[in-house]
């Protein structure tokens, strides 16, 4: 109410950054500049642990431990992105059977059918991402690649120009 009376602002000053971000996103979407796909690693990205080494029962995901809660929250966030039209895909150095077992973990939020593509193999991740882009007929600039491993992120960023590769600070810890 203070800002209305002083400056005739129709909203709280704290709301302006959120509004500006929303307007910017609308403008970006009108010009086709939003990201369309999120490509995810599995081990230590969608769950804590390495499914091939720890087994499904050894993964940290779900309400039992704080680390597992964090991964479940991240999976919920990814599921919410899917619900608004973001395409989800997997790019993981894993045996496919292990990857699918991890994605079917009883405490997991995401399931194999949430992903349009699951590349769980031992090929370089940049090649898998290029294959996913080709299958979906999307340019690399439509993708975000999320991986806990800084070396994998660096390779993908160098080999797949245009893909967004955010640093997952703290993921290695």
For each predicted feature, which ranges?
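Extracellular glycan-modifying ectodomains
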Residues: 1-39, 46-47, 52-53, 57, ...
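Phosphate/oxyanion-binding active-site loops and adjacent basic polyanion-contact surfaces
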Residues: 12-19, 66, 70, 95, ...
């Amino acid at each position: 109410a203070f800002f209305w009376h002083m400056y005739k602002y129709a909203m709280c000053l704290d709301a302006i950054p959120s509004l500006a971000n929303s307007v910017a996103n609308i403008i970006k979407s009108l010009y086709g500049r939003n990201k369309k796909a999120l490509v995810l690693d599995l081990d230590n990205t969608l769950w804590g642990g390495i499914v091939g080494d720890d087994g499904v029962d050894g993964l940290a995901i779900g309400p039992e431990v704080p680390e597992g809660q964090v991964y479940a929250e991240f999976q919920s966030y990814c599921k919410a992105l899917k619900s608004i039209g973001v395409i989800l895909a997997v790019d993981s150095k894993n045996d496919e059977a292990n990857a699918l077992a991890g994605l079917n973990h009883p405490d997991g939020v995401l399931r194999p059918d949430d992903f349009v593509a699951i590349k769980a193999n031992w090929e370089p991740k940049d090649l898998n991402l290029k294959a996913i882009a080709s299958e979906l007929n999307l340019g690399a600039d439509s993708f975000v690649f999320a991986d806990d491993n800084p070396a994998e992120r660096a390779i993908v960023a160098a080999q797949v120009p245009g893909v967004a590769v955010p640093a997952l600070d703290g993921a290695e810890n």
